[in-house]
Amino acid sequence: MNAITMRPIAESIFSEKALGRVLWTDITSHIDIPSSNRSHMDGFVVKHSDITRISQYGPIKLRIIPKRKANRKNQKLLTGRSTRISTGEVMPLLGDTVIPLEYTQFGSKNHTITIQRDFPKGSFISYKGSEIARNDLLLSAGHVLRTQDLALVSVLGIRKLKIFKKPTVAIIPTGNELTNEINVAKGGKILNTNSRVISDLIEISGGKPLDLGITPDNNDKIKNKIRVALSESDIILTTGGSSVGVRDLVAESINDIGKPGILVHGIKLDRGRVTGLAALRRKPVIVLPGPIQGAANAFIVFAQPLIRVMLGLNPFTEPLIIAKLTEDWNARKKFQNFTKIVYVKISQSVSGEFHAKPITGETTDITVLTKSNGFIMVPERLTRLKRRQKVKINIFPGLSFSSGSSIEFP
């Protein structure tokens, strides 16, 4: 991390566009809510001293005075008097208790009411500042805004919010074999699905994807794309062209542009071992493998934490589910001392217990991802997981569920 600088940036946006965004500053209330004492029920306002005799002498009668429509809060309630009030209406001066309608009875010509029972002083009144007081801290910096938070902001009359700006993440897919055309892919080319997957993962992680398009295996063209990415984005991801032990044009291009260049090329991650990590102009460059599982794994381990740092969030999310494995799982022999990512299909029994079935396949198999809805991070020291063993399952937005749906475990 010494080779890069992750400096979050603030921006102001209208509150109606802020769902899911991260607050840059605290929000404190500049008003009291309620702004004055208000009735919590439909009924009659009384002075409590007028109804204390009910418990001893039974129901009492009070004279009804008409309510003043304007400046209700300046209307005084005198002894022996009562006035009608509606839910949410401002309390008149000296009125200190509300009697619900169902405990009153109108007298002749509706000039008086009979109150059937006593209520504690202050009953059915929402006092000034009882929900929110002036200078209360309501939302803290770093909070991810939910719909109820934005409703609160609206109540406070706040039109604009200062939030963490979404980091722009550039995607540079490389390789002569790639195409975006399905018909061309049928003729021997490889359909560029990685860009779609990585772009969606960037967006759902809180970043702003910038797809710079397929780049052929040409050193100068790769360098030009990287230079564009350096000027227009905060984080750069390349996909494909990453290998260890053979000529790697992406790594060469990165090193040609400047120092420090490639910092790590090849990591102990299964799948994703040919991932490269680099730095240029204090910006992180992640060289993702071409095979889809390796690319997704490297994104989870390296790219998403960087996006979260730029958003002022904890870089690592916690596992959300504890589940029992439905079958044994064994690490591949030559990768036993690697960190392993095991994709699983989570289901839930009638009793509510979660179960996880390991999903295996080739590193290029997109179906490993489509059949799964969670994954296990298996540390280097573990080479085997046993049936019925309890494991921590990571739930990753975009891979486990879409942003517009709930998590479902059939």
Where are these regions (language model features)?
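Short, hydrophobic/aliphatic alpha-helical segments
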Residues: 18-32, 71-84, 277-278
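Short glycine-rich, flexible loops that bind phosphorylated cofactors or substrates
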Residues: 92, 147, 244-246, 294, ...
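Flexible glycine/proline-rich
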Residues: 11-16, 25, 38, 132, ...
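Helix-rich terminal scaffold detector
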Residues: 159-288, 292-301, 409-410
